[in-house]
Amino acid sequence: YTLQLYMEFSGCMDIVIGAGRLLGVRLPENFCRPFASRNAAEFWRRWHITLGAWLKTYVFYPVSVSRMVKKWNRFGKKHLGKYLTRLGATAMCLFPVWLCNGLWHGPSWHYIFYGMYYFVILLAGAALEPVRAGVIRFFHINERALYWKIPCILKTWVIIFTGELFFRANGLKAGMTMFFSIFRDFRLSVLWDGTLLDFSLDKGDYLVIFAGLLLTAGIGIIKERNLLKGKGLQDMRTPFRWALYYGLILSVLIFGAYGIGYQQVDLIYAGF
């Protein structure tokens, strides 16, 4: 579900940004390879960037300079110390941001829980940051090395996929049922016993999905590591560039879903 949401939303925004550029309008980027993030805070700096920027400007910053936070900082410096003071101020600023994030998607308890889930995750990250920094210093860990980056990315995936489970659920109770069923009904055998074919998808559909994921991941890695040195399609030689254009059009014709019997399905995010 999370990957489908990303493909739809990010792809739609790419179309909008591209159409805007054809008309001479440059729109802000809304996604920046979020699944390469090493923690939840970084993920939300890369995912739905415009919503995050709005919440930061109109919720986080006003709260951070509010009288309540200033009073807390003065009290904390006298009685609590730097660490607890900063953590308390962080909690005061993050809580309304993530409450608004949840309510922005809808006035429902599972959306509120979704926002509070990230509030707890990000606050825990801020609380444990000194521990993380101490571990890195003690063991002389190179944060750019793959042995560190890959586990961090995988850990972030678990956090994000768990959050999106509650986002996808039809209600908070349904979300809890879905979450606990992961542990109660966990079976790796569903990957090869034919269960996956019960979701109205055949082997050809899964092949297309797998190929799309590989292509998306490959392009993401190339852009994340800047392997093209900032060059894009416009920097390619004309024959290669047009061959790629026609190849992309052909891929839509081959893999696209259309024709007799096709029923158009609304984008997931169209509901928001």
Task: Give the location of each predicted region.
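Membrane-embedded transmembrane alpha-helical bundles that form the catalytic cores
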Residues: 1-271
